[in-house]
C-alpha cells in the first residue's frame, strides 16, 4: 500500500499537532512546541463514525485485564516532568497506566495501550492535557470554594479551617482532634483531594503531636496565633519527628523578632513559606529574603500576581477586612500600609520568572481567589515574557521551558512540598488520573473536562434538555464522578501517624486515605524548574529589592490576557 502524504495543517486538524508544530496558549504571548510524538504516523487511533476505533480495527477483542478503562487519544501533554509531548494516555483503575501508542496489537505495530470492548474513549485531538492543579493555601471558609476550584482545573486543596469561624477567616488551621475528625468526615462529600493543616502555634510539642495523630497532613504557623521563634522551633521539631510539612505566615509586626530571628529559628530545616512576598503577611518589609534560602520552599498567593495598576488599591481594602482592622484606628492603617509595598510586589513577578519563587496558591477568601490560581500563573508568565523577553533556556521558536517552569508552580512543586508527589502533581505513569483537558484557545482559563481518579467529575456542559450536549447555556456542572460512592475517585491526605491511629479507622471514612511522606529532606533544589537561590536584599527605607545585587523592578501591567475577553458570559 502506498503512503498517503498530507500537509501538516491537515494532519493537525485531524489528529492534533505533532513534533515541531507550535501552538499559542489562549490569548497569551506564550508559544509551545511539541517536543516528541509517541503515536505512529499512519497508525493513529481516533473515535467516531468511519474512524479507527472500531471492532477488529483499532479496537481488539481482549478482556479488561489486558486493556485500559479509558484512553485519551492524540493528546498534547503539557507537564513539568513529562514535558510537552503528543501521546495517547491510558487510564486503568483510576490511575495513569501508560503514556504512548494506543490501538489493537493484533493488527497494529508499537501498541503500548490496548483498546478493547471495555475501553471508553475521550478525544484528545487538538486538546491540551495537564495534571490537575494543587492549591496549597486554602482557608476552608465555605465548601462552595471546592466547586469553584474544581471548575478552574484544581483537583487537590490543602489548607485548614472549620468553616466561617473567625479563626478560619484569618488562619489556615484546623485545630484539635474534634475539628480535624469532623473535617475528615466532611471531606468524603467532595470530588476533590483534600488535606488539612493543624494549628502549629505551640511552645510545647504534645498538642502538636496530638493533631498530627488526629489526621492532619501538616501544621501551620500563623502570626495571628503567635509565630514566635519558640513556636517555630517547636513546630519544626514535631514535623521532623512525624514527617509532615510546616507552612508559615510569619510576624508582620516584628514583635517577637525580625526576619533574621525567624530564619534563625528554622535552623536549616525545611519549611513552606506562604505569600513570601509579604503582602499576605510576614515580616515587614523583608520577609521576601526567605526565598533565597536553600531550606525554604516559597510560594505566592494569587492577588499580588501579576503586578498590575490595580494591585495596591485592592490590597489595602482586602487587608482591612481579612484581619479585622479598623480604618478609624491609626495603628491599623499603619499595619496595613506596612504590608502593601509596590517594590516587593513588583520583585515577586521577577523572582517567579527566575525560578526563585517555587509555587502559586490562592489564600481562598482570605486575601485570595480560589478559582484564579491557574489564570494568575499564566498571566504572570505572559507579563514576564513581554517585560523580560525569552528565558535563556528557551529559543526564538518557543517558550517551552518558561511554560514548564510556570506549570510546575501549581502541580509538581506543591505536591513535592507536601509529600504527595507519589500520588498527584504530574502526568506520569502510576499517579492518580487527575487530569484536565483544555481547548488551546481556553487554556488556563476555562477547562473542558476535569477528571478525578480517571472519572469525569466536572465539565463545561450545555442544556441538559437539549437534543445534543452543546446548546447554551453552557456552564460548569458536576458529572457522575461527583456523586455517590464515585467520590472514592478522590483521596484524603493525612499523616502516617494518623493512618496508623485506630481512631481514624473508627471514623468509617469512605474516601481512600493516603499518607504523606518525604517532606523533611526536601531542599529548594528539589523544586522542579524553580530551584534558584539568589541572595535577596531589601532596603529598609526605600524597599528596593535586589537579587545577587541586581535591582528587581518591573512596571505594573495595564492589560492582561485570560481576562475580560473570556468572561463576557
Curated annotation (Swiss-Prot):
Keyword flag Isomerase: no
Gene3D superfamilies hit by this protein: Metal-dependent hydrolases, Urease, subunit C, domain 1
Modified residues (N6-carboxylysine): 220
Subcellular location: Cytoplasm
Residues noted as binding Ni(2+) 1 in the record, renumbered to the chain: 137, 139, 220, 363
GO MF annotations in UniProt: nickel cation binding; urease activity
Record: active site: 323 (proton donor)
Cofactor(s) required, per the database record: Ni cation
Protein's name in the database: Urease subunit alpha
Species, as recorded: Dechloromonas aromatica (strain RCB)
UniProt gene name: ureC
Amino acid at each position: 500500500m502506498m503512503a498517503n502524504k498530507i500537509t501538516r495543517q491537515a494532519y493537525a486538524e485531524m489528529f492534533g499537532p505533532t513534533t515541531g508544530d507550535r501552538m499559542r496558549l489562549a490569548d497569551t504571548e506564550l508559544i509551545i512546541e511539541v517536543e516528541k510524538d509517541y503515536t505512529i504516523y499512519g497508525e493513529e487511533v481516533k473515535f467516531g463514525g468511519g474512524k479507527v476505533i472500531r471492532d477488529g480495527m483499532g479496537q481488539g477483542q481482549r478482556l479488561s485485564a489486558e486493556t485500559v478503562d479509558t484512553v485519551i487519544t492524540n493528546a498534547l501533554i503539557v507537564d513539568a516532568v513529562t514535558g510537552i509531548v503528543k501521546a495517547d494516555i491510558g487510564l486503568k483503575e483510576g490511575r495513569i497506566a501508560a503514556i504512548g501508542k494506543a490501538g489493537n496489537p493484533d493488527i497494529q505495530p508499537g501498541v503500548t495501550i490496548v483498546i478493547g470492548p471495555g475501553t471508553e474513549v475521550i478525544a484528545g485531538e487538538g486538546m491540551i492535557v495537564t495534571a490537575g492543579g494543587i492549591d496549597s493555601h486554602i482557608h476552608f471558609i465555605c465548601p462552595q470554594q471546592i466547586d469553584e476550584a474544581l471548575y478552574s482545573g484544581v483537583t487537590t486543596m490543602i489548607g485548614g479551617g472549620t468553616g466561617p469561624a473567625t479563626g478560619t477567616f484569618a488562619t489556615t488551621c484546623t485545630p484539635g482532634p474534634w475539628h480535624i475528625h469532623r473535617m475528615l468526615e466532611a471531606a468524603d462529600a467532595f470530588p476533590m483531594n483534600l488535606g488539612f493543616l493543624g494549628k502549629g502555634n505551640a511552645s510545647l510539642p504534645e498538642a502538636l503531636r496530638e493533631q498530627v495523630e488526629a489526621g492532619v497532613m501538616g501544621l501551620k504557623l500563623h502570626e495571628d496565633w503567635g509565630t514566635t521563634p519558640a513556636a517555630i522551633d517547636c513546630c519544626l521539631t514535631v514535623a521532623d519527628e512525624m514527617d509532615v510539612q510546616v507552612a508559615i505566615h510569619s510576624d508582620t509586626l516584628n514583635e517577637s523578632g525580625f526576619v533574621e530571628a525567624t530564619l534563625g529559628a528554622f535552623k536549616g530545616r525545611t519549611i513552606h513559606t506562604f505569600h513570601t512576598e509579604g503582602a499576605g503577611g510576614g515580616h515587614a518589609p523583608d520577609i521576601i529574603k526567605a526565598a533565597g534560602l536553600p531550606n525554604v520552599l516559597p510560594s505566592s498567593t494569587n492577588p499580588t500576581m501579576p503586578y498590575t495598576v490595580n494591585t495596591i488599591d485592592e490590597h489595602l481594602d482586602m487587608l482591612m477586612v481579612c484581619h479585622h482592622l479598623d480604618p478609624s484606628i491609626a495603628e491599623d492603617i499603619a499595619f496595613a500600609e506596612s504590608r502593601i509595598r509596590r517594590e516587593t510586589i513588583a520583585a515577586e513577578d521577577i523572582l517567579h520568572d527566575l525560578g526563585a519563587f517555587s509555587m502559586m496558591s490562592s489564600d481562598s477568601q482570605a486575601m485570595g481567589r480560589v478559582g484564579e490560581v491557574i489564570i494568575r500563573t499564566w498571566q504572570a508568565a505572559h507579563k514576564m515574557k513581554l517585560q523580560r523577553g525569552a528565558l535563556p533556556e528557551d529559543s526564538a521558536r518557543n517558550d517551552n521551558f518558561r511554560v514548564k517552569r510556570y506549570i510546575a508552580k501549581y502541580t509538581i512543586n506543591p505536591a513535592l512540598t507536601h509529600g504527595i508527589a507519589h500520588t498527584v502533581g504530574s502526568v506520569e505513569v502510576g499517579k492518580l488520573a487527575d487530569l484536565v483537558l483544555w481547548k488551546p484557545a481556553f487554556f488556563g482559563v476555562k477547562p473542558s473536562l476535569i477528571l478525578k481518579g480517571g472519572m469525569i467529575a466536572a465539565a463545561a456542559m450545555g442544556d441538559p434538555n437539549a437534543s445534543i450536549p452543546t446548546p447554551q447555556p453552557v456552564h460548569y456542572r458536576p458529572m457522575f464522578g461527583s456523586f455517590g460512592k464515585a467520590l472514592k475517585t478522590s483521596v484524603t491526605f493525612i499523616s502516617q501517624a494518623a493512618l496508623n491511629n485506630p481512631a481514624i479507622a473508627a471514623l468509617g471514612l469512605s474516601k481512600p486515605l493516603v499518607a504523606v511522606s518525604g517532606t523533611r529532606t526536601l531542599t529548594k533544589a528539589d523544586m522542579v524548574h524553580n530551584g534558584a537561590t539568589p541572595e535577596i536584599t531589601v532596603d529598609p527605607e526605600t524597599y528596593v529589592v535586589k537579587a545577587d545585587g541586581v535591582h528587581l523592578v518591573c512596571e505594573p501591567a495595564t492589560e492582561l490576557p485570560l481576562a475580560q475577553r473570556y468572561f463576557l458570559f
